[in-house]
């Protein structure tokens, strides 16, 4: 893992099989000490407990909507502002462009820079409703119940 070619370390936050959580902080430190970005896949953890991206000091974190009881085809990506400002969009169109000419284009301000074309409005409303549902139950209650179920085996 200490190769000079290392650019990104992407890791699951929580196993979907055993529910285990790897030593995120240690792996993150190792990645950053080698100049790599650290990206966390929170698909399993996001619907089970609260995640503090500042405490984890990740460069980016993502999770899918369907793991949050929401619709398929949508998810969430959070990334540090400096990373989002540095990277280029990979899909183009719509209101993501601030100004365009025959020889140049400038991107809209974040987050619109990455919002090409027509947004998935139905999926976004569905995901928001799913997150509201989880919030109503309470992540602490979900975590407590999961812990109790896991300890009974």
Task: Give the positions of each predicted feature.
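Positively charged, low-complexity/disordered segments
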Residues: 1-2, 149-153
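Pyridoxal 5′-phosphate
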Residues: 4-148
